[in-house]
Each structure stands twice: as C-alpha cells, then as structure tokens.
Amino acid sequence: MSHTADGPSLRTWWHDSGEINRATMVKPGNVRQSRKYRVQVSIAGANKFYDSFAYESIPRNGRGRIYSPWDAPDSNTGVANDGITVEISAGITMAWSQFEYATDVDVKILPHQGDMLPDPSKVKIRPTSIRYDIRPSSDGGIIIRVPPDSNGRKFSVEFDHDLYTYCSNGLEYVSSSDQNGHIVSVEPRNALLIFASPFLPNDMVPRIDAPDTKVMTPGPINKDDWGSSGVLYFPPGVYWMNSNQKGDTPRIGENHMKLHPKTYWVYLAPGAYVKGAIEYTTKANFYATGHGVLSGEHYVYQANPDTYYQGLKSDGRSLRMWGHYSLGGGQTWFCRGPTINAPPFNTMDFYGSDNITTRISDYKQVGAFFFQTDGPEMYPNSQIHDVFYHVNDDAIKTYHSNATLTRAIIWKCHNDPVIQMGWEPRDISDILLQDIQVIHTRYIKSEMDIVPSTIIGASPSQNGQFTTDLNKSINSFTIRNLVCEGICPALLRITPSQHYRNFVIENVAFPDGLQKHHVNTGRSMVPARNGVEFSVAIVNWTVGGHKVTMENFRADQLGQLDVDASYWGQWSIR
C-alpha cells in the first residue's frame, strides 16, 4: 500500500497500476514501473518518508522494431537504423521520479528487490558540480539531502556497480574486450533521474471547476473525447489513445489529440500519465503546464499521421509530442512543468508563422532513444530555463534571434551536436546560452558532414548541397558556463554557411578530458569557406584541469583544434 504526501511543503504521487516489465509493452492502463529502484521523500530530518513513483522507460518501449502500429511485436518491419544500437542487449533503462517541494527534503532511494545499494562513496550524482549530502539508510538504501530551490533540482543518481561502458571501433559500438574498441562513454545501465520541482504558481494551474474546462476521465481516449473547451484538464490517472482517426477501437498508437481551435491550454496534473501527443490549432497564446507526463510510448519510430501512424519519415509531418501547424502569428507557447517520455520523432515544432515565441521552464525529456529526438525549438525571443533533455539529435537548436537558454542539463546519445546552429545559412543575432551541464555523451564515430559529433556544431546541409551566403551572419552569440562531464567529444565542429561575428565561448570545462584515440571524436574542425569571417573568441577553456591557450590548442595538443589556416588572426583563445 502506497503512502503519499499532499501538503504545502511536499507533494508526491503514485500509480496503483504500476507494471514491472522491461521486455514488452505494458497494458494500456498501466505505467511502466522501475524494476530497480524505489523512491521515497521526507521533509528533511523528519524521517517520515512518503512514496514517490519511480517511472521507467526502455528502448523501443517493448514493441520492437516495427513499421506499423498494428505489426506484431519484434517483427522487424521497421527501418534497420532507428538510433537504437546495443541498448536492448545491454539492458539499458531510464527511470525517473518527480515530486513537488518547498523546503529541504531527504530523498531515499531503495533497491526494488531487497538488494543493498552501495555506500555513498560509490554513488555519483550528476551534474557533479552541484554537491549533495549522501548518507546510507538503515534499510539498505541511500538518502540524499535536497535543499529548496525556486528553480528546482534535476540530477542523475549513478551507482558504481551498475555502469555500462560504451566502446567504439570508429564505426559501431563493440564489446569492451574488442582490441579495436575504445571507451567513448561510461553511463548507468539502469539510470535514475530525480526531478525535484517547485510548486507551480497559481496562474499556471487552471481551475478544475471552471465552466470552460473539460475534465478528462482516466482510461481510454477515443475520437474527439477531448471536446472543445478552452482548457483540457487531466487529473491524476492513466490515459491512452484508444481509437484511430476514424473512431475504430481499440487502436493503439494510431491517433493523437488534435485540439479544437478554442482549446488553448493542456494541464497535466501531478500523477497524470497520458499516452499520446498534442496538436494545437488555436490562434491565441497556448499553454502546457503541470507536473504530469506525456508519453509517446505507443507510437512507432517516425510515426506519420498521414500514413496511419506508420513509420514513414517526413520532416514536416512525422508526429511531434507538441505540435501546431496553423499558427496565426503573434503567439506565445507557455510550457511549464511537463515531462516528455519516449518521443517517436522531433519533440516540438510549430508551423504557419515565424511570429511565434516560447516560455519553457521545468521541462523534462526522458527515454529519447530513437534518432530525431531533439530538444524543443527556440523560436525568436524565446526564454528557456531549468530544463533536462535526454536526446538523440540536436539538443539546443539555435535557429532564431534574441533567444536565451539558462540552466540546462543535457544527456546526449550519439546523433548530432549538443548545440546546433546549422542546416542552412542563417541571419541571426543576440543568442545567449549559459549554465549548460552536459552529463553524458557517447558518439560512435567521428562525423563532420550532416551530423557533426561535437558539443557546438553547425551541420552544412540536409541534402549534401553545401551553400554559403555572405550576406548573412551569426552575430552576438554567447555560450557561457559550459561543463561537459565524462570523456568529451570535440568542443566545436562548424561548417560555416555564413559569417560568424562576435561569437564568444567562455568559461568551458571538460574536467575528464577530450577523446584522444583513433575514433577521433575529440578533434574540433572548422573547414575553409571562401570569403567567410570567423570572429570567434574562446575564453577560459580547460581540459582535464589544464587551460587551453594559443600555445597548446593544435590538433595534436591539449585543445585538439583544427581550424583552417585561412581564418588565422580572426579567432582567439585566451
């Protein structure tokens, strides 16, 4: 019997329909529960612990590699290269637990099946730059003291006895015993993330009893059940898309919620778990708030609504977890609190107008094992802060001007850079990215064209047609306070498609060093482009605790920088 907290200082939640199952799809009305961990939370020092549900995500969501949502599990009808490599055979999982708090709390982590967790000296919390007090508990677990924080806390708890070593031969992951293999990352086999969130302000929680609110009932969601009210409210419980677009039932993974034009707000209450995706059609400002979960676990990779949700890739139409295809202009998307699990493609895109901006905070993305699972778009004048992105594509997409991102934690898989500013020539300015913690990366091979394996990157094009536009520039772009943990890939791999002016990278730390082996992912590269300016300043960059300077930056030295000689005198390291 679970025991949860529901007070002004602490709120936790639980699902009685938790299903421990790491091999197949869970029942539609169930939630996959961590088979490894139990999480409890107490007001600090009170020693009165309340249950906090530990969710779990697994690669391919137990469906296997399938093309159509009605295909038999593990029938291998889907594309061979979906971004998932050794994860299933290695038993990789990702668990998370979330709660709301307003004071110091103690988070207790217990093994699920009676084992003992290691003593605190064999526990690492990432980002490591933020220190936590860890002590053993008398019942075989550990207790982590989490201080109050108006921005919340997000961290990974990692145990020395449960790590997986990713090794690559430069083409693919290989066994650690392979003599041609080199370590590219060491990560948890069974990850555990803790999301300690501040309570939402009143203006981010709609009234459940308001006349313009549609309150959903936990269970199956059939065609048009979501109605036409202004607010769509999901109370605690489990929900799933149960019909196809024609209304036939049961049909799993064959529909999403295309909201009525009057509906502008989706609220996911703490404890709401919605298996589906959201498409807005409103011309007003629109919202997604609440500490519930929106999960794409029922969708196949690259699910395309235009082909009955089969996995036919379309950059424009494959399913987004948050989408809008008919913007009216002058709109803002307010997103505060949700967790996104198992996206089947890009997580968020809005179309129809360039006059769109976002305000995103306390946003979490987990279980992003498929390719194309990127971070949210940063539209013009966007402000994003206090986010956690698990991604297997571009994490931070900087395609528009006057955008700010602050306090981001990134767990990167093996596709595309962490920070992306390429694909086509751009004319943008006034970008600020600061306080970025990259806690894991695991690039398989050295790539420069299309999908550069690097922290800061600019892909030259999507179709192999490299274009340079000397009438455009990326100007006044600052990356500040960037930390990459573990053995890191290159700082930058940029194919210039336009000028770079007043581009500043400052206060960068790679405490565990750069990759140095023949896989060659540690080398930064900037090839020549005729007539392009490359005015870039790197300030206070350390690798393994040693400062990179103009005396030790070269490809065979500490910085491993290979910048074409044509740019000499335009860029600097100090």
Where are these regions (language model features)?
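Extracellular "leader-to-stem" segments immediately downstream of a signal peptide or signal-anchor
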Residues: 1-254, 275, 293-314, 544-574
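Short, solvent-exposed secondary-structure boundary motifs
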Residues: 133-137, 244-250, 268-270, 337-338, ...
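Core residues of folded domains in eukaryotic genome-function proteins
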Residues: 153-155, 230, 262-264, 284, ...
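Residues in well-ordered beta-strands of folded domains
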Residues: 158, 235, 289, 322-323, ...
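Residues within well-ordered beta-strands of beta-sheet-rich folds
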Residues: 233-235, 265-269, 287-289, 334, ...
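Glycine-centered loop/turn motifs
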Residues: 236-237, 253, 263, 271, ...
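Beta-solenoid repeat scaffold
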Residues: 254-272, 278-294
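Glycine- and acidic/polar-rich repeat regions and solenoidal domains
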Residues: 276-279, 285, 294-332, 337-569
